[in-house]
UniProtKB/Swiss-Prot annotation:
Binding note for cofactor: Binds 2 iron ions per dimer. The dimer may bind additional iron ions.
Protein name per its UniProtKB record: Iron-sulfur assembly protein IscA-like 1, mitochondrial
MF GO annotations: iron-sulfur cluster binding; metal ion binding
GO biological process terms, semicolon-separated: iron-sulfur cluster assembly
Transit peptide, residue positions per record: 1-33
Length: 137
């Protein structure tokens, strides 16, 4: 048996590799995104990251009419969110929630890649962000 046949047989037994989900939404987040998209009559919400704040990165959310060539599409609980390519490595595995109480009404991101965030919670840092900062020094 050739090596390629052995590998093919092993792959067939194991099945496809599980891919970590880019983004998951709580019911509250999905409900709020659905409301916002209906209100603006837009098909997508686009999630990105922007360099700002004392810890390096901040999340951005914008309405979108179409999927960009390299955007990652997340369809969950009846809503569609596009993740910008440059944000992908910083947000993979993140859970998006929505908090609405007497003090605030905002989306909250529970990010397993976060290596720290500033005191006010406006910005965060991932391993990729901290590596880039150290390289620039």
């Amino acid at each position: 048996m050739k090596a390629s046949q052995i590998l093919a047989a092993a792959a067939a037994r194991v099945g496809p590799a599980l891919r970590k989900q880019v983004l998951t939404l709580t019911d509250e987040a999905a409900s709020r995104v659905h409301h916002l998209l209906q209100q603006r009559q837009k098909p997508f919400l686009r999630l990105g990251v922007k360099a700002r704040g004392c810890n390096g990165l901040s999340y951005t959310l914008n309405y979108a009419d179409e999927k960009g060539k390299f955007d990652e599409l997340v369809e969950e609980k009846g809503v569609r969110i596009l993740v910008e390519p440059k944000a992908l490595m910083h947000v993979i595995g993140t859970k998006m929630d929505f908090v609405d109480d007497k003090l605030r009404s905002e989306f909250v991101f529970i990010n397993p890649n976060s290596q720290g965030q500033c005191g006010c919670g406006e910005s965060f840092m991932t391993t990729s962000t901290s590596s880039a900062k150290q390289s620039a020094s």
